[in-house]
Swiss-Prot record:
InterPro entries associated with the record: Amanitin/phalloidin (IPR027582)
Lineage, broadest ranks: Eukaryota, Fungi, Dikarya, Basidiomycota, Agaricomycotina
Residues of the propeptide: 1-10, 19-33
Coiled coil regions in record: none
Cyclopeptide (Ile-Pro) cross-link, renumbered residues: 11-18
Free-text function comment from the UniProt entry: Probable toxin that belongs to the MSDIN-like toxin family responsible for a large number of food poisoning cases and deaths.
Organism of origin: Amanita phalloides
Family stated for the protein in its record: Belongs to the MSDIN fungal toxin family.
Protein name: MSDIN-like toxin proprotein 2
Keyword Lyase: no
Amino acid sequence: MSDINATRLPIILAPIIPCINDDVNSTLTSGER
């Protein structure tokens, strides 16, 4: 079971992480401006 979770987590997080990075970057840039 742990092996299955280890292989699934990167697949699930792959599309989510870029979205979070975009949000953080947008907030940082707007705050600096």
